Amino acid sequence: MSNKKTFKKYSRVAGLLTAALIIGNLVTANAESNKQNTASTETTTTNEQPKPESSELTTEKAGQKTDDMLNSNDMIKLAPKEMPLESAEKEEKKSEDKKKSEEDHTEEINDKIYSLNYNELEVLAKNGETIENFVPKEGVKKADKFIVIERKKKNINTTPVDISIIDSVTDRTYPAALQLANKGFTENKPDAVVTKRNPQKIHIDLPGMGDKATVEVNDPTYANVSTAIDNLVNQWHDNYSGGNTLPARTQYTESMVYSKSQIEAALNVNSKILDGTLGIDFKSISKGEKKVMIAAYKQIFYTVSANLPNNPADVFDKSVTFKELQRKGVSNEAPPLFVSNVAYGRTVFVKLETSSKSNDVEAAFSAALKGTDVKTNGKYSDILENSSFTAVVLGGDAAEHNKVVTKDFDVIRNVIKDNATFSRKNPAYPISYTSVFLKNNKIAGVNNRTEYVETTSTEYTSGKINLSHQGAYVAQYEILWDEINYDDKGKEVITKRRWDNNWYSKTSPFSTVIPLGANSRNIRIMARECTGLAWEWWRKVIDERDVKLSKEINVNISGSTLSPYGSITYK
């Protein structure tokens, strides 16, 4: 409160000083005026009463006003007049700004980008999963089944140059866009470099357009480039599509699914897309409960390319400095990239899924995808009859086949064939792009390195041995087999088994059934007959050491002592 009063007091004092200065000037002026009046009135009679000088009256009034102001609580407000900048200074500032905007940093940009020191493979290396511990084998008993789940550590190395486009990155992956070669790029989440640009020429490869297929975009932003591409496409539809058919350009890849990082590297696609659209159950796959194959069909309608620069600075406005690029992330660890082309069309993802434990699943799925008639192959037909199929279409008239789930693979074939022709009703969609290093126009390929566990499951069914002795002799048998299990570390545990009547003499006719568990392996069947000959008392009729487990193993012996006969058949 005291500060406020003090401030008011000093404000009044300042005002009074100003007023005093003005009054002083007035007094001086009046004094001079009075002198002149005195000289001109010397003839005035002396008997008149003298009048008080005007200066004295003015001083009295000023003093009274000063006292009133000092005793007042009102603040005296002073409004200092704003002094404008000198015109010379303004002109100088304007000149400096203009000079700065006209500075040419082309040589600096070229020198700095050419001098960036990096390894293309290292800056775009993507290290996926590293597998340390896993159970190599596991045995699961279910009723009359024994399921062996086998896991093998494998690795995959790929360097794809065409990167799948997802909706969330379309504004960073258009033709002529600038990006950073960093971790975000390897994860399909590129960082954009936004700055003032030089005009950029782009070219669309739709047939029949000739010179009209190339246009220059003055300011190559996402919006401007997209508008230019739309205009080119509309020109083609309006003027050139009548007598021209698009060349068929279909890219097809397939892979069994074992893990997220593995399928990303194998198909060059973000696993989140597949997981979200196709609903891949990675957990069931790792347990060996399901087998899944993914196929990707890329149908390219046209490609838009951006003219590659001769020098790095060609893409920038001359006012852009290297310091500005550094502020936006450019460095040895994240050199700049240039999107050289974008493919437009549609992508069809197909998921084939089964719970079959057959080792022929992959072959059956591949045959179906390639259009092979699998009905003539009993094994393949059985697998496909117990499978489900899902197709998801990205791009084109996706509303018609957004997502199809069926048990009939012919339906999937129709999805792939339908809407494969480019038209206004079936528009193209950005599906993949390629970038180059701005320094030297080398293609930027993501170096995928990942380990994964390949999980396979084999199902075995319990069986039996049917023994039948119809020979004219005394016979003996030896039936041996192993039962396989696995401990918690995946190590194989073998238990030796034998038939209780091994080496017992059996006369004809004789028959019996020996049950075998689903985990039976290394089956050995031996049968011998007594010849009665002193030099060869026992003669082997059957001696098989690697009999395969089957639903029914029929072992038959017959004949005479000198001419015995034996056979093993399977059902």
From Swiss-Prot:
Location of region: Disordered: 30-108
GO MF assignments: cholesterol binding; toxin activity
Keywords of the record: Cytolysis, Hemolysis, Host cell membrane, Host membrane, Lipid-binding, Membrane, Secreted, Signal, Toxin, Transmembrane, Transmembrane beta strand, Virulence
Residue numbers covered by motif Conserved undecapeptide: 529-539
Biased composition (Low complexity): 37-48
Chain positions of motif Cholesterol binding: 564-565
Recorded topology in the membrane: Multi-pass membrane protein
SUPFAM superfamilies xref list: Perfringolysin
Biological process, per Gene Ontology: killing of cells of another organism
Biased composition (Basic and acidic residues): 50-68, 79-108
Secretion signal span: 1-33
Transmembrane segments: 260-273, 280-289, 358-367, 375-387
Pfam families: Thiol_cytolys_C, Thiol_cytolysin
Domains (record comment): Mature protein (about residues 103 to 571) has 3 discontinuous domains; D1 (residues 103-124, 161-249, 300-345 and 421-444), D2 (residues 125-160 and 445-461), D3 (residues 250-299 and 346-420) followed by C-terminal D4 (residues 462-571).
Family affiliation: Belongs to the cholesterol-dependent cytolysin family.
Protein name: Streptolysin O
Organism: Streptococcus pyogenes serotype M3 (strain SSI-1)
Gene label: slo
